[in-house]
A protein has these predicted regions:
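Conserved C-terminal C-lobe helix
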Residues: 158-171
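Conserved activation segment of eukaryotic-like protein kinases, specifically the C-terminal portion
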Residues: 82-100
């Protein structure tokens, strides 16, 4: 069994204290690694359901892996849209968060696209080194508002438009417009 050096949340906090922003190639490397793992799960009809920086472990040589499969669930294709509420509130997709707010037990949603939203928020946190950005996004009701908020937090000189557009597609409020892991994998082949 491998032993992780840290988790991504701890690393992001270290970088925030040191004011050491991720370089684009680092973000892309991490994104590719995590996308491959989550694409594998999606291909095998498994949704993680609790993606957050604390559940992303860092191993030697900057290898990032998804961990804590305690909330993971095999998804029946016929019932894919109906799922119980799982996940960490700050990293929940809009549909799951709405269900939590209104105390709903089951929510109609695509669990892979909910995982994608959670992963997108992890990357926003890493890119901005600021958890506040996630709190602001939680209150947004349309993508234009999100883009306006992110302009205040993102240093667009550090990251290409291409990368920013990928992150936007990961956190699109409309799950029908949001990437799944197959689509993200295809997009990442262009980097």
């Amino acid at each position: 069994m491998e032993r992780a050096q840290s988790d991504w949340n701890i690393e992001i906090k270290r970088r925030k204290i040191a004011k050491k922003f991720y370089k684009e190639y680092e973000i892309i490397s991490i994104l590719k690694q995590l996308s491959q793992g989550l694409f594998f799960l999606q291909k095998n009809k498994i949704a993680h359901r609790d993606i957050k920086p604390q559940n992303i472990l860092i191993f030697p040589n900057n290898i990032y892996k998804i961990a804590d499969m305690g909330e993971a669930k095999e998804i029946d294709k016929n019932k894919m849209q109906m799922a119980t509420l799982r996940g960490s509130e700050l990293f929940m997709s809009p549909l799951l968060y709405e269900g939590l707010k209104y105390n709903k037990k089951n929510i109609r949603h695509n669990p892979y696209k909910s995982d994608m939203f959670s992963l997108g928020l992890c990357f926003l946190y890493a890119i901005c080194l600021n958890l506040k950005v996630l709190e602001y996004i939680r209150e947004m009701t349309n993508m234009n508002n999100i883009k306006n908020i992110l302009e205040k937090f993102l240093d667009t000189n550090k990251y290409s438009d291409k990368l920013i557009k990928i992150v936007y597609k990961m956190i699109d409020l409309d799950e029908n417009k949001r990437f799944d892991f197959n689509e993200l994998e295809n997009e990442l082949t262009q980097f």
